[in-house]
Design a protein with these regions (language model features):
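A short coil-to-beta-strand element that immediately follows conserved catalytic motifs
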Residues: 15-25
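Short, conserved, surface-exposed binding loops centered on an aromatic residue
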Residues: 16-18, 37-41
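Amphipathic alpha-helical recognition patches that constitute DNA-binding helices
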Residues: 7, 25, 47, 107
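Beta-rich nucleic-acid/ligand-interaction surfaces
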Residues: 23, 28-35
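Single conserved hydrophobic/aromatic residue that forms the stacking wall/gate
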Residues: 1-12
Length: 123
């Protein structure tokens, strides 16, 4: 039944996104950028990034993920048109250690959030 399918689509990993808003950001980081390990605010229900690597930057420029003791456990490769998504929580540590950016590190970030933006998700 289509309403059941729609209802399932609005839930990701036990997160009800039906009353959320979509927030889209175009990001362009340059040399010197870094982002200390952090967990997202609780108002950010889901985060996703799509990498836009048009300048053949190093694959090492992807997002770093950490364990609870802030040991780096994975770097998502910074490949063109490649990305990830995750739901926020108390152990979703991520950031980016200071790395060499030759020209620029571009990304498109799409978040589902609880606060109002221009794009309401219809339930």
């Amino acid at each position: 039944h289509s309403s059941n399918r729609r209802q399932r689509q609005m839930c990701i990993r036990d997160r009800d996104l039906s009353n959320s808003y979509v927030r889209l950001e175009v990001i362009c980081d340059r040399e010197g950028f870094w982002l200390k390990p952090h967990c997202d605010i609780e108002e950010k229900l889901m985060s996703s990034i799509v990498f836009v690597n048009l300048h053949n930057e190093s694959e090492n420029l992807g997002t770093d993920f950490y364990d609870a003791k802030l040991n780096k456990v994975k770097t998502v490769p910074y490949k063109h048109n490649y990305g990830y998504f995750f739901t926020s929580g108390p152990n979703t540590w991520h950031g980016m250690e200071k790395k060499e950016i030759k020209k620029e590190r571009r990304c498109i970030q799409i978040n589902y959030v609880t606060f109002e933006t221009d794009w309401k998700v219809k339930s």
